Amino acid sequence: MATRLTKDLSRRDFLKFSALASAGALIDFRSSSEANLLKLFEQSKTDLLGRVFKDGTPSYSEPSAKGQQIALHNYNDVLGLKDAVILKTDHPVNEVWYRLEDKSFINSYDFQPVENQLNAPQSEIVSSGMLAEITVPFTDAWSSSTNGKKSNQIFYFGSTHWVFGLGEDEAKNLYYLVKEDRFNNTYYVNATHMRIIQDEELLPLSELIPLDGKHIRISLRQQMMVAYEKNEPVLMSALASGQLTGSTDLTTPVGNFAINYKRPSRHMVHSDRMGDNGTELYGVPWVSYFTETGIAFHGTYWHNNFTRPHSHGCINLPIPAAHWVFRWTQPHVPPREQKFVSQFGTQVEVI
């Protein structure tokens, strides 16, 4: 059984690429030589904003918890970013820190890189629904569109949701009518905070490669996945697999599997194999299931703790990586399909 994800990367370079991947970058071996990948690593930068995950999150004078504490930040604070700093250490902690605009540093574990992109609302929405993503750090999901409306939920950057209509409130603000996919509850969301995902963004990748020409290998020890075409690595990403929490074993199962079921958006609850305890997660993006018990690849907006076990069994990925896996693997999902089931999917090896 292989113990290395790729045959060409040294341990030192693997650590470098792992750190870059944990910052949300995808390592595409097809378009980059090793030298170019190293250059990409050294020049890597983050988005311009970041969202804080929890109250009391500290920033420091240097990229280390041993530095002077500069400030404490609260849940959903949105902070300006300058760049990412990759620590060249070999101990099992997150190696990525973000430098803030005030020149202090915050650990990437506590912080989601986000954007603040406003969008022109799309007036024509097909009756079967259209997939959309949140493009601002977070936005309210209202239970009604009238005066005295109450915010029931918050939707977060990168989450995906099904839109079924465009409306207007008393103040002439445009909103999308969103129906979540588990209980069919209806929410009203500022239409400028969502971007309708175009059909071409859902088309399959490398579709000429036959089913037996693709596979994904997951290393639980290295907390990395590599996708292969005809046994050549084509893409690498950091991940967060299932964890052992006290006497409860939520670790990701080892073995050989196949992707058999996909959803581009899923409302996950405590009965699912999700990432946080006692939490409901709305609009989990790009879900590709590969076991009968519901273990899946999916995008992650509620933590940024890649390269360490963190989930209830699923393979948590940076959102761009989960989107890539969703498109690259079989079965291919037609645009505007809310779910798709097939027993003939891409092979997944977990070691």
Placement of each model-derived feature along the sequence:
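SH3-family beta-barrel domains
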Residues: G24, E34-P63, L72-Y75, V114-G148, ...
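Boundary regions of SH3-family modules and the immediately adjacent low-complexity/disordered segments
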Residues: N36-Q43, R99-A132, E180-L211
